[in-house]
UniProtKB/Swiss-Prot annotation:
<dbReference type="InterPro" id="IPR013761">
    <property type="entry name" value="SAM/pointed_sf"/>
</dbReference>
<dbReference type="Pfam" id="PF00536">
    <property type="entry name" value="SAM_1"/>
</dbReference>
<dbReference type="InterPro" id="IPR050548">
    <property type="entry name" value="PcG_chromatin_remod_factors"/>
</dbReference>
<protein>
    <recommendedName>
        <fullName>Sterile alpha motif domain-containing protein 13</fullName>
    </recommendedName>
</protein>
<dbReference type="InterPro" id="IPR001660">
    <property type="entry name" value="SAM"/>
</dbReference>
<feature type="domain" description="SAM">
    <location>
        <begin position="51"/>
        <end position="119"/>
    </location>
</feature>
């Protein structure tokens, strides 16, 4: 009985969402910010190392973390900083609730770091 109950619970767990594909829009960006928008252009997201603070904020707003995105702005996290963040930085340094912080790190920060390393190691 307990096993079937657990199986039912775990059957409801969804896989993490995939990262949206992004493109760069440099027009009308007087503050030096790289515009981030959903797109399949280039077949991959632009290098997050080039993102300004507002690009990081807009990325997290776009992927559904509207409330938490402001923490990246308050802490002045640009793309280079984002790529250097550890799990502990996200869980404690941004002063976010644990649930969203875990999702932000596991489903977004870590994959962005992995893609950046993969794209820049070859």
């Amino acid at each position: 009985m307990a096993n079937s109950l657990l199986e039912g619970v775990f059957a409801e767990v969804k896989e993490p969402c995939s990262l949206p594909m992004l493109s760069v829009d440099m027009e009308n960006k007087e503050n030096g910010s790289v515009g981030v928008k959903n797109s399949m252009e280039n077949g991959r997201p632009p290098d997050p190392a080039d993102w300004a603070v507002m690009d990081v904020v807009n990325y997290f707003r776009t992927v559904g973390f509207e409330e938490q995105a402001s923490a990246f702005q308050e802490q002045e996290i640009d793309g280079k900083s984002l790529l250097l963040m550890t799990r502990n930085d996200v869980l404690t340094g941004l002063q976010l609730k644990l649930g969203p912080a875990l999702k932000i790190y596991e489903y977004h920060v870590k994959p962005l770091q992995t893609k950046h390393l993969k794209n820049n190691s070859s």
